[in-house]
């Protein structure tokens, strides 16, 4: 028995910023943040296409989600020609960053020429370049496509003798829209839940006969928070206002290179050296490793960049307090 509960519209997400590119490349491609930026740098600087060097993507250090009007026009035209007019919304989509400290000085990361599809230029790219370019190309394309229409559905499956009923909740695609091209990945859930409404279900007919292939009995428990990955740590840094698009990858790289953390199966695990350093800084320099202090300092640096705050004032205020902490350290044995 299939029961349709409601039809919902699922809208596409914005094109990539530096942080979202690093997160999605980590989830979908298994790239570290550093590797993502290294490959993106090459795509930005230019690839030799038939004896002509062309930059394939826009600047890859950005917190902006907006793209130029010319690019939007070209993308909408491409979608209409490739998928049909019902796959483009009536009006172009415009996005604005939700990050508190976003400067949006640059466009989102997008292909510079949408006629250069991944398939068309695949022979000019190495394996990693093609994977990342394909990710950027599809994400940008999907950001200007029509919303997907999903039927929230409950399906009951009964045994032949009607003694057992299995129930599952999920969605069935009524109209794919942007899902025709791209679906976002997510970090692993930190808790178990019976709520599987996000699951995509196949189209089933009333009284359709199904074959049981496998039956598993599972017991779920509440799980502790998952360890950070490159993707989830970059996301957390952005939420806390720590760092900039230009520093996310290098920050994570330093943690590994200095043996503060190690990577196991993509998870970042603190090493003894990292734990000792954290304990020392928290005890003696707690103010300076506080998330709020770092976020506030980032905002002050923005004010200096905009000419709203003299840099000497910031340095003077910082050093006056910091020196007091340093002087206290000289008394430690």
Please provide the spans of the model-predicted regions.
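Conserved short loop/turn motifs at secondary-structure junctions
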Residues: 9-14, 23-32, 57-67
